[in-house]
Amino acid sequence: MDQDAFILKEDSEVEREAPGGRESLSDVIGFLDAVLSSEPTDIGGDRSWLHNTINTPQGPGSAHRAKSEGEGEVSTPSTQDNRSGEESRVSGRTSKPEAEAHAGNLDKQNIHRAFGGRTGTNSVSQDLGDGGDSGILENPPNERGYPRSGIEDENREMAAHPDKRGEDQAEGLPEEVRGGTSLPDEGEGGASNNGRSMEPGSSHSARVTGVLVIPSPELEEAVLRRNKRRPTNSGSKPLTPATVPGTRSPPLNRYNSTGSPPGKPPSTQDEHINSGDTPAVRVKDRKPPIGTRSVSDCPANGRPIHPGLESDSTKKGIGENTSSMKEMATLLTSLGVIQSAQEFESSRDASYVFARRALKSANYAEMTFNVCGLILSAEKSSARKVDENKQLLKQIQESVESFRDIYKRFSEYQKEQNSLLMSNLSTLHIITDRGGKTDNTDSLTRSPSVFAKSKENKTKATRFDPSMETLEDMKYKPDLIREDEFRDEIRNPVYQERDTEPRASNASRLLPSKEKPTMHSLRLVIESSPLSRAEKAAYVKSLSKCKTDQEVKAVMELVEEDIESLTN
């Protein structure tokens, strides 16, 4: 059957069956898609027309929406007006004369455009204008039943059979439209690029179109859900990003290794392989993309990825622990911490035990544990020593305070003893000096109880003083005491001197007349002496009671003895 004639015949039948006589070109192409998919063997062997440039008479504000049996939807809504999918279909209609004019010129390219565009494009089905549900299938079914294979196997197969790509695309496998360059964006946000503003969905081609897609929270969630690993139909254990060490979910809104702009979510291999409209191809041997950092240097078990280095260092540490213990024991012995190396090995102290265990550690974790124990035990021992020193200082302080108290009480007791001793000495002095002061030494009346050394009478050169008188024989006698022939006849010279006599000197006239001059001068001698006040008062009182010159002489002798005893 002639293909062009079949297309024109079906197109004319569709136009006649339309209720209003006007149908959009997408409905015609969708009908042709259903007819052609039932009989794929009628298409000729020449498939070079599949790689030609697509030219469609759609306007800049149109949007394509199609559905295939059992598969997801692919929609590119316009950013100029936020309309629903049904309104977008109506907005893409053309007039009846235009449909008739283009119906005669439809060729194999339009047929491929309708058929391959539904099965080969991989787009993020997200309504950016309405912000509705993205409609991305979490686990797209493997409805066509094609066997899943790895990327490397498919690449080798495609390199061996270059014509197989066209066959895969005709049969519904994902393949990018080939034969021409990508059209530039004509509208805002790439809405008028005839569905090419979305990311390419080919798993065989490495080309990435740098078209911007405005990100949104729903779009990011959709990309994250798509990047999750999906379980295969064979019932194998599903692989998650946590158990696969070579994959990492790329961060959003950042430049990745492919150089995509920040506004575009990064496209991963899962996005090309497990698209909403294409059968998911399980990739078993997945390599991380070039330019991206490996996810983790340590796997899930928590150990580093270089077990050889750790085992070597562990063996080396086991071999060296004996020598390390010997060196440590030698060092402690040389520093004077311990007496001998045997004491370090046999000591039961916590610090020494942890030190030996740290030196015998097989790995870093055990060594860290033992070093921590060593530090804590040393801190505990130092804290204990600090407490002991505090207790010792407290005891020393208490003893010092007790010593101060004892010294204070001793000093007070010593003062009391000194005062008592001085009083005893004064009493003894009175007994020895005053006792036995009589003319006859043989009298038994007032014999001294303590015999002291006898005093030697010393003659003192006394300076002449008119207010002073002496009863001893002096070379120069003062005028107050004058020897004359009448003196022996006077019984009481003190009381009889008040009479004015020519024998009186001129110095006696200068003294007050209320008191006798001799008594006044004697009282001055007593008061000017270094005796105590009580003694002075007693001597003055006894002197005033004297009746004769002998009594006055005896009193003055006692005064002179006391003065000499104090001065000597």
UniProtKB/Swiss-Prot annotation:
Transmembrane segments: none annotated. Homotetramer. Interacts (via multimerization domain) with polymerase L; this interaction forms the polymerase complex. Interacts (via N-terminus) with N0; this interaction allows P to chaperon N0 before encapsidation and form the N-P complex. Interacts (via C-terminus) with N-RNA template; this interaction positions the polymerase on the template. CDD domains: MEV_P-protein-C_like (cd21031). Residues 1-23, 38-320, 496-516 are annotated as: Disordered. The gene is P/V/C. This is Phosphoprotein. Changing S68A: Complete loss of phosphorylation. It comes from Sendai virus (strain Harris) (SeV). Signal peptide: none annotated.
